[in-house]
């Protein structure tokens, strides 16, 4: 049953990648912040020569692909680390994607993703920080949703913070202590609590935090993180943005979930291989609507290269010995 459920999850995801209803995102202004001060060690150990943020996903650098489904904002701020492999190449590629891209380079490691994001936000001029919402996201996943659903939540003045969540992700059921979990009021999208690295109930059905958060005001993000740090709320020695949602609640902010329809993760070599396997399969299967050329995430100039990579091959028969 689990295998069938996983197949359906991927089939639905790739149907949506080819569906025009999922082909746009809301425009909200403000800032997108992508903390990516890690070193991508798992990919290095697997022999990847390209730094993790530049590893191709559908023909585009992973860090660029991760922003494709986020609300359109006036600025994209990527938070990097000085000693990360390929720093100069990463900055060059990111800045070439858009004049709205800025990079913040930290001099060394921090005590967690939340601190890295806070430092990135603080590096933005104060006048710009005050303008528009702040969306924070990871550099190694994407999410599919109907734009009107997110727009309705963004337009609701009763929404201070949005936590992007997903249900039914197979790896969450297999490795529940790798994820953040959200508790909501019964039958509501209003968040009542967060559990980081500890599942709340049924990991196969409960919502996981995807790593994307939208704050109506960037100052609320800073207040929540600073409160979390003041109470030393570390998980495994690090400060997580997931955890600061508890502080947002304590500050009286209205926190709501936005459940995306498909969660696409490329965070580990196995995650990326799995995504590429299903992309190759569905593109080849006549009975499935997905085609590479109809996927807006696929770089047009890389289409031929992807087809070559995914070309059908016949396995070599083993030698027979009498």
Model-predicted regions and their roles:
Residues 2-35, 42-49, 55-56, 60-136, ...:
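Conserved N-terminal catalytic core of the sugar/cofactor nucleotidyltransferase
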Residues 54, 182-184, 257:
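A structural signal for short hydrophobic beta-strand segments in well-ordered beta-sheet cores
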Residues 4, 108-113, 169-172, 263-266:
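A short acidic, often aromatic-flanked loop/helix-cap motif at beta-alpha or helix-coil junctions
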């Amino acid at each position: 049953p689990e295998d069938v459920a996983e197949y359906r999850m991927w089939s639905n995801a790739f149907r949506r990648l080819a569906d025009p209803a999922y082909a746009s995102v809301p425009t909200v202004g403000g800032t997108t912040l992508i903390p990516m001060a890690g070193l991508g060690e798992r990919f290095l150990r697997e022999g990847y020569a390209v730094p993790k943020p530049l590893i191709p996903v559908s023909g585009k650098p992973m860090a660029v692909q991760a922003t494709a489904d986020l609300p359109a904002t006036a600025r994209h701020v990527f938070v990097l680390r000085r000693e990360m492999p390929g720093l100069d190449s990463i900055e060059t590629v990111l800045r070439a994607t858009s004049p709205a891209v800025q990079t913040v380079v930290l001099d060394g490691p921090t005590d967690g993703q939340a601190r890295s994001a806070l430092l990135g936000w603080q590096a933005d001029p104060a006048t710009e920080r005050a303008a528009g919402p702040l969306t924070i996201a990871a550099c190694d996943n994407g999410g599919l949703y109907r734009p009107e659903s997110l727009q309705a939540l963004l337009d609701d003045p009763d929404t201070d913070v949005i936590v992007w969540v997903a249900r039914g992700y197979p790896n969450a059921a297999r490795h529940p202590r790798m994820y953040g979990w959200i508790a909501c009021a019964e039958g509501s999208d209003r968040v009542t609590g967060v559990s980081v690295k500890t599942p709340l109930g049924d990991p196969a059905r409960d919502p996981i935090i995807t790593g994307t958060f939208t704050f109506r005001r960037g100052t609320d993000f800073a207040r929540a993180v600073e409160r979390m740090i003041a109470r030393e709320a570390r998980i495994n020695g690090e400060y997580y943005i997931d955890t600061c949602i508890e502080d947002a609640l304590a500050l009286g902010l209205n926190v709501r979930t936005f459940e995306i329809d498909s969660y696409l993760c490329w965070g580990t070599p196995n995650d990326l291989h799995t995504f590429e396997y299903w992309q190759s399969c569905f593109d080849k299967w006549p009975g499935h609507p997905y085609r590479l050329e109809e996927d807006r995430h696929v770089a047009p100039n890389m289409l031929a290269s992807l087809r070559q990579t995914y070309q059908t091959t016949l396995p070599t028969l083993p030698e027979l010995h009498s």
